[in-house]
Amino acid sequence: MTDYKATLNLPDTQFPMKAGLPQREPQTLQRWNEIGLYSKLRKIGEGRPKFVLHDGPPYANGSIHIGHAVNKILKDIITRSKTLAGFDAPYVPGWDCHGLPIEHKVETTFGKNQPADLTRERCRTYASEQIEGQKADFIRLGVLGDWDNPYKTMDFANEAGEIRALAEMVKQGFVFKGLKPVNWCFDCGSALAEAEVEYQDKKSDAIDVAFPIEDADKLAAAFGLSELSKPTAIVIWTTTPWTIPANQALNVHPEFTYALVDTGERILLLAEELVESCLQRYGLQGQVIATAPGAALELIRFRHPFYERFSPVYLAEYVELGAGTGIVHSSPAYGEDDFRTCKAYGMSNDDILSPVQSNGVYTPDLPFFGGQFIWKANPAIVEKLAEVGALLKHQPIQHSYMHCWRHKTPLIYRATAQWFVGMDTQPKQGGTLRERALAAIEQTQFVPAWGQARLHSMIAGRPDWCISRQRNWGVPIPFFLHKATGELHPRTVELMEEVAKRVEQEGIEAWFKLDAAELLGAEAADYDKINDTLDVWFDSGTTHWHVLRGSHGLGHTTGPRADLYLEGSDQHRGWFHSSLLTGSAIDGHAPYKALLTHGFVVDENGRKMSKSLGNVVAPQEVNDSLGADIMRLWVASTDYSGEMAVSKVILQRSADAYRRIRNTARFMLANLNGFDPAKDLLQPEQMLDLDRWAVDAALRLQEEIIEAYADYRFWNVYSKVHNFCVQELGGFYLDIIKDRQYTTAADSVARRSCQSALLHISEALVRWIAPILAFTAEEIWQFLPGERNESVMLNTWYAGLERLPEGFELDRAYWDRVMEVKAAVNKELENLRTAKAIGASLQAEVTLFCDDAKQADLAKLGDELRFALITSAAQTAPLADAPADAVVTEVEGLKLKILKSAHAKCGRCWHFRADVGSHAAHPELCGRCVSNIEGEGEVRKHA
């Protein structure tokens, strides 16, 4: 028996079947570094339209987690796809470096009593170390960026830029000093930003407290009574007993109806709607003796339960009837609404009682409770209220309460003198900051769209922004305050520029070590130099000012706008929010044109990642076990607009999908063996119909893929590429071409046509996957035939795909119909295989009983119909001639009859043909194979 293997064009490639990504990816990273890929991208980007994705800086503390990986991979997919779309899309990574978590880490290591300058020095060193670790992990993910020149909020230039941004806001009149309740953490010893507050369940003491009447005659008159017949008290309900010592007012809603309720021993004042529930809570019987609107109670005085002072009634529309008594006890130092209401009634800052110190301990001079920590004082306060007969009910409750995101300890609102950016302050020119920011939101694209309403509601309802902190490790607020008046120095903006110049050279230490006389001269004696630092959200929120404005060549000289900010959904109240406020204040618009939000990562059961649950997926472990490309594929395949589920099982599914794409690429590379595009590439009109269809299908798909990338629908890109590999290619085209590819003459039109199509599809495919499978695309690129540059990323979307001409007979609809018929044939072949009536599909001879239209349709392929169906013989016949045992298919107008071929099997092409053995010199071959190895070779037109 002759071995005809040498006469076949068998597939051959050095492209490995086994990906070995954990070992191979680091080699690719090294190669990118050696060829200076990022620099080359910037070079070829010169003159292109610019697309700027501004990096929201991660905090320089701890190892990266799966959420960081998702964020950076999404950004990399975008910048890579924009590069392929013909943009100059730089990516400058950044880090957020100041703030309490780093300072806390340093204090934990070195103690709290070290000198402030040494603390700052150690914070800077610690942040630098953390950045290096995170940087290595981000690079390992395949993220292309300017890693040698990232921006860091602690860089001297950025610290100076932040001071200049603040100066702009001062100049426009947005910054003021005020006494206001702010989120306060005792452990931090500082105010917290809204984004640093999280909510957890907390057990609290809910108490109902009676405040006895002082202005009895006025109260009787308000209710239309001549007098009050019994002792009378107004009742409040609160879950913060520790605020009772600071009570200064009682708030009622002007439009609610209030009732005097006779309970036997005394009369209680309650909201009429809540009388029944309150009496039930107190275990009392009672009768309503009079009612009055809340507005009638204004300024009537009651007595504090245990201090010798009065609490007047103020009208406040924030009072609700959802719980309690309909009356709110007001401690203006410890509540935003309380503070606003008391200020509206003319209470001065000096009149506001603030007995809680920064560490949560009452001042020593507070009667009964001085020197006690507020949470520990709660039982003593409850006991005191009971002692004086003011406690109507005490009941522990579990409720959601604000906590410090770092220490996980409860927070309070605490009125302190702080620096604020005013939301409704009228600036020197233009609208208020709230008006500007709300208008800017309307001009911003949101992906997904619901982000717009979310950010709008946050801006519409937010209070003034407290930008000052009482910490060491932060950018200073370089203000001088007049000792007598408390006013800012009249040359503040000018002085801030002088400070910025020094900070540019020496860092923030330049301010802290500054002798005021150096800038103020003789005036220094009249001014205090303040040592407050800026909220870290002001740090990151002003990066558009110094990063986009030119320090990294990302923007314009004035009013820069990034094309895109991309972060997790929590950043609507974080970086998106602070950047919007600073951009609107300084430039009158948002610093971004579009905001893209991704969801949080959860496990396959929708639970948050937690070490205690054992469901944490660490990106470092995925890199080492499966490879970064698998993680990148998981990210791309997941709809990021909601929660993103990940687990080992889910990642294994991504690995399976990856294998399908890789194997498809490998098959095409193997069949491009010996193909030189410079001399072997055919023009479209020279190619077979099926090959032209495949190229046209790739072009149509490419158009959809480009659109999906532009719309940030990466899961659509993944599904389209995967389906193309599985269905159009793997399930149809690549199966059909094997016979022609392997058996026709090496240089025949039939084979070169097929190889031309494979090259076009491979050139397109490698670009489609490059933004997602960054490492694998680069690997494929190195194995593609023909002259090419060093990296797939140094190119744009493939322009060599050709559309089928208008009016082409075997158009895309035609091949769709052939696919439908082939699927029906395959289904019956599988049934016969299961019944062991047949082996390989080439053992089959199929008769297609068709209606007239379908018979005429399939007849266009002539004898090549058998190649399209991958059977040894295929013929059509009228539907009316179908025997009773013909198989009815799901295709309208088509029945099938499949028989096992009685002919001999060709030893070369494995077709079962009647002419096997008809050639004496090659008794094992069919006539077609003899022609292909000795004669002129077969001619194919269609398939």
UniProtKB/Swiss-Prot annotation:
GO terms for molecular function: aminoacyl-tRNA deacylase activity; ATP binding; isoleucine-tRNA ligase activity; tRNA binding; zinc ion binding. Keywords: Aminoacyl-tRNA synthetase, ATP-binding, Cytoplasm, Ligase, Metal-binding, Nucleotide-binding, Protein biosynthesis, Zinc. It is found in: Cytoplasm. It is an enzyme of class 6 (ligase). One of its GO terms (cellular component) is cytosol. Coiled coil: none annotated. InterPro entries: aa-tRNA-synth_I_CS, aa-tRNA-synth_Ia, Anticodon_Ile_BEm, Ile-tRNA-ligase, Ile-tRNA-ligase_type1, Ile-tRNA_ligase, M/V/L/I-tRNA-synth_anticd-bd, Rossmann-like_a/b/a_fold. ATP binds at K611. Binds 1 zinc ion per subunit. L-isoleucyl-5'-AMP binds at E567. Its cofactor is Zn(2+). One of its GO terms (biological process) is isoleucyl-tRNA aminoacylation. IleRS has two distinct active sites: one for aminoacylation and one for editing. The misactivated valine is translocated from the active site to the editing site, which sterically excludes the correctly activated isoleucine. The single editing site contains two valyl binding pockets, one specific for each substrate (Val-AMP or Val-tRNA(Ile)). Belongs to the class-I aminoacyl-tRNA synthetase family. IleS type 1 subfamily. Catalyzes the attachment of isoleucine to tRNA(Ile). As IleRS can inadvertently accommodate and process structurally similar amino acids such as valine, to avoid such errors it has two additional distinct tRNA(Ile)-dependent editing activities. One activity is designated as 'pretransfer' editing and involves the hydrolysis of activated Val-AMP. The other activity is designated 'posttransfer' editing and involves deacylation of mischarged Val-tRNA(Ile). Monomer. This is Isoleucine--tRNA ligase.
